[in-house]
Amino acid sequence: MAEEFKATASICGGGGGAWWNSPRSVMSPSDHFLSPCFGAAITSNDFSSQENHLKSRMTCTDNNNIVFGQREADSDSGGSTVTMDSTLQMMGLGFSSNCSSDWNQTILQEDLNSSFIRSSQDQDHGQGFLSTTTSPYILNPACSSSPSTSSSSSLIRTFYDPEPSPYNFVSTTSGSINDPQLSWANKTNPHHQVAYGLINSFSNNANSRPFWNSSSTTNLNNTTPSNFVTTPQIISTRLEDKTKNLKTRAQSESLKRAKDNESAAKKPRVTTPSPLPTFKVRKENLRDQITSLQQLVSPFGKTDTASVLQEAIEYIKFLHDQVTVLSTPYMKQGASNQQQQQISGKSKSQDENENHELRGHGLCLVPISSTFPVANETTADFWTPTFGGNNFR
């Protein structure tokens, strides 16, 4: 184990140069997974001095080692495979590999030298997170001939998958992946091509912005202008609404003015309320009075106006005579003469009409002229009738 560690250390750090030149590894989230050879790199000047060591380790004879980096030749490229051993056994990982392949020095001279030189140039700028040789194209699981190799290669492939990292780890100068000299980059697995596209999207973003999804960009490009409302259309609709509002306001104002003019033309009636209360006077015609009298005397069977008036006059005279007869005993002045005349006249009439009585004529009314002397006399005289009072029943 010590000899193998020395051999790998001589391979990785033979000239003091840096092979992958990155403060962090892209392969895994932790820096403790990788072997110490990832902290150094083989430059173009030191690569020739390490050829003898590479020739001595052309095959993978130890089953405890795992093929870490491998490049398999396709039928079109015509190249040979490149393998590289890293003792992950020392790191505590029990991976095994049964594959054996050869190193082709010419491919390493052509492909790796260009990428190594550019990675060393990126070191001067202080941005070495994404490098050309640390891309997932080094790993190719096609060379594994045992289940242990395929499982280990799939496990390592998961470490190569890109994970979300802060913006300050993205390298803007790692453009050597797009170099046309690396023709083997286009002949890898589809899984590697997806990872390659993700790394390019991170590296080409100069402002360290998150990459956009291609489907979303195509959807934005395929949108038609009819889906969006332009500002001139909005302005035109607003102007139309304003004109309509102005028209309606003008119409309402014109209607209000017309109503005001009509109300001003009509003058209100000036009525001065009278201070005295108004009494309603009933107007009656002579004909209405006659008809009312006829209705009163109609039971008698006389509809003639003259006959009705004559009857009323006779009845009034009779009432007047009755009042005078009843009021004479209560009057002292001229009562004696009047009483004697009346008594003599009544005695004659009683003889003629024995059955004639004042009680049969109804209510007796007293005239106003006879009430004045009665009111001036003493009250005792009313209850002590004088001569002739005994004639009344």
Curated annotation (Swiss-Prot):
Residues annotated as coiled-coil are: none
Q: Does the keyword Transcription regulation apply?
A: yes
Kindly list the places in or outside the cell where this protein is found, as annotated in its UniProt entry: Nucleus
Where does this protein chiefly localize?
nucleus
Residues of the region (Disordered) are 248-277, 332-356
SUPFAM superfamilies reported for this sequence: HLH, helix-loop-helix DNA-binding domain
* Organism from which the protein derives: Arabidopsis thaliana (Mouse-ear cress)
Instruction: Write out the biased-composition intervals (Basic and acidic residues).
Output: 254-265
PROSITE patterns in alphabetical order? BHLH
Q: Which GO terms describe its cellular component?
A: nucleus
Q: Which UniProt keywords apply?
A: DNA-binding, Nucleus, Transcription, Transcription regulation
Protein name in UniProt: Transcription factor bHLH112
- Record domain bHLH: where: 270-319
Give the Low complexity compositional bias ranges: 332-347
Pfam entry (one): HLH
PANTHER family (UniProt xref):
TRANSCRIPTION FACTOR BHLH112, TRANSCRIPTION FACTOR BHLH83-RELATED
Any one GO molecular function term: DNA-binding transcription factor activity
A Gene Ontology biological process in which this protein takes part is: positive regulation of DNA-templated transcription
Assembly with partners or alone = Homodimer.
